[in-house]
Amino acid sequence: MFVTFEGVEGSGKSTQMTRLCAALEAAGRTVCRTRQPGGCFLGQTLRAILLSQKTAGLDDRAELFLYLADRAQHVAEVIRPALAAGQVVVCDRYTDSTVAYQGYGRGLDTTLLQNLNAVAAAGVVPDLTVLLDLDPAIGLTRATSRNAAAGTAEAEGRFEAERLEFHQRVRAGYRALAAAEPARFAVIDAAPSPDAVAEAVWGVVGKLL
């Protein structure tokens, strides 16, 4: 089973992934927790480039192809082998992030992005995509505070530095994607307490076990 988590910055993906992975392991499943970018050796290097505020001037198309390179290698090196071994793969961001951020956020052609995603993903499609839906203004406050506390504002804060309007477009993109594929997406309100959100996530994932 392949589960992906999507959402705007600060939507709580890391927290909910931790809880879901623990619940899956308690249910006797072997879990591969991973992320894009950064889920493989190449991805770690690309992540440092993509998220750093030092690369604020990165061209939108260059940004896109770095994400696609990460995805292609990550699928081949991590995701596909884990699925073949019968593991439950839980991934922080996947193809939908590219459409939401580089498409709706940056303004690149979404049809082109879907086609490029298909090449990079090589047929590996999530069984379930959990979209943690949150007002971007709230999410940015959370994410900025998190990075400040961790001392990662410069190293991992490039997207948090974008204007609120950018993140509003990203959210709208996610909602459009979810509306187009209701069978794959589970849209969960990320505003309530972490416990309440975790319960909602498990309510969806548990049905697929």
From Swiss-Prot:
Binding of ATP, residues: 7-14
GO CC annotation: cytosol
Single GO term (MF): ATP binding
Enzyme class, spelled out: transferase
EC number, UniProt record: 2.7.4.9
Alphabetical UniProt keywords: ATP-binding, Kinase, Nucleotide biosynthesis, Nucleotide-binding, Transferase
Catalysed transformations (reactions): dTMP + ATP = dTDP + ADP
An example Gene Ontology biological process: dTTP biosynthetic process
Any Pfam family matching the protein: Thymidylate_kin
SUPFAM superfamilies to which the protein is assigned, alphabetical: P-loop containing nucleoside triphosphate hydrolases
HAMAP family from the UniProt entry: Thymidylate_kinase
The family this protein is said to belong to: Belongs to the thymidylate kinase family.
Function, in words: Phosphorylation of dTMP to form dTDP in both de novo and salvage pathways of dTTP synthesis.
Protein name (record): Thymidylate kinase
Organism encoding this protein: Solidesulfovibrio magneticus (strain ATCC 700980 / DSM 13731 / RS-1) (Desulfovibrio magneticus)
Lineage: Bacteria, Pseudomonadati, Thermodesulfobacteriota, Desulfovibrionia, Desulfovibrionales
Gene name of the record: tmk
